């Protein structure tokens, strides 16, 4: 049914040719789809095809589908005119006349304008703006003159001198223009020029002067009496009943309006119990108004609170990884949750602080990882990427793999003994000690330590050599001075020193023939006396080491170890960085 109606509307919109073709097509369609009956044998003979069969209805349906009349809903969009552009402003000027339309608060002779304009002017936008500024300045100048004139009159009245005895007429023309211009400049600077844009009421004398200046010769005095009656009628509201309203004498009842009470005895003097006005009574409900005010104020405060809460939740806080990437310098004490992400294999912009207690020693059968950090201690850094960085092979270092006889030294690629919690400590005092125990008691006699770990040699001196030998490295022989400083902590922080010192201190690693650590036969867990560390210096502040690493300075070497350094580093330069130690 909808399709038929749509075609009907389409036929109304089409021209004569299209409507005729559509009508012929619809008539032909009706003839072909007319049902065959026994009463019309001629039609049956005409409709039969060459094979004696009637035409199929599919042909008609195909013809109907192929016909797509244009829709009345899809019309070509009309070309809309461009945006409105103002190229000029026409100003019409009307002469003043006595209005009879407004009710001023005092006096008569209201101001109005004529029904037809007298002149008109055409301004451009810039000219009209300048004209407005000029008109406002002129209004402000006249107002300043009037203020000066009123001040002068007040001075004469205070002094007791009559205006006639002043010698000059007290008019606006008597005011000095130079003083007015000075006051005008100050007023414009203070922003009083915008005040001239608002309409200001004129006193009765000024209204009469404006009318006479506009050419009004006769001012109707009757308007003054009419305005006085209107003002009195507006002031006289409500009934004058005293407590009790008599419907026969109450002015509100006689006027057919309700009595009204805003506050006690105003405007109507009747009370609630004594009001007999048949039209009713209206009272001002202060409680209702106050309740409405409180509800409105509460609703506004709730809306403002919701908006402020939405503004606070909109900014997304940076993740620890983004904060570490944005910060140009590493924090002195990174949070526990970001210690895993702040440590790196070869990085000059990371800092890891690990506080270790040198007075604890554990048996070899102690678990290798006594305290593993939980999920809350993991940083946002992907552990797979960290493990890929840590699990470097000999081909990455450029060192050919050498197999030792007897299988004492395992494959350098086998770094299964490393754990992320051991390298990037979580602040556990026994983490490094447990790591050294697990390495000394494991089947793999030599684990691989990251050669690029930025470790400062001065951190060992902060806790003493004895604290390092006894607390950090189990089984090592210590000195009496180390017992006094076992409780101190040492910091693995940034420094200009490389990792030769820590590699020399650890038992399972060697940096060359001059740096090999010999074990005492019969006690594999105990170490002989250490060779003197080349870069040991008096303990200094970690910030000093960090600044030296930025400017590229190296840590000064003590004069006592200077001869040893020269001989050792000449041979150590030719030795590989990492050399397995046969057990």
Swiss-Prot record:
Subcellular location: Nucleus
UniProt feature, compositional bias: Pro residues: 364-373
Compositionally biased intervals (Low complexity): 18-41, 335-361
Annotated tissue distribution: Widely expressed with highest levels in thymus and lung. Low levels detected in naive T-cells.
Ranges of biased composition (kind: Polar residues): 54-69
Up-regulation conditions: By interleukin-2.
Alphabetical list of Pfam families matching this protein: CSRNP_N
InterPro entries named among the record's database cross-references: CSRNP_N (IPR031972), Cys/Ser-rich_nuc_prot (IPR023260)
Gene Ontology, cellular component aspect: nucleus
GO BP terms, alphabetized: apoptotic process; face morphogenesis; platelet-derived growth factor receptor signaling pathway; positive regulation of transcription by RNA polymerase II; post-embryonic development; regulation of DNA-templated transcription; roof of mouth development; skeletal system morphogenesis
Primary location: nucleus
An MF annotation (GO) of this entry: DNA-binding transcription activator activity, RNA polymerase II-specific
Keywords of this entry: Activator, Apoptosis, DNA-binding, Nucleus, Transcription, Transcription regulation
Disordered: annotated segments: 1-79, 306-381
Organism superkingdom: Eukaryota
Gene null: resulting phenotype: Mice display no obvious defects in development, hematopoiesis or T-cell function. Deletion of Csrnp1, Csrnp2 and Csrnp3 together causes partial neonatal lethality, suggesting that they have redundant functions.
Family: Belongs to the AXUD1 family.
Main function: Binds to the consensus sequence 5'-AGAGTG-3' and has transcriptional activator activity. May have a tumor-suppressor function. May play a role in apoptosis.
Descriptive protein name: Cysteine/serine-rich nuclear protein 1
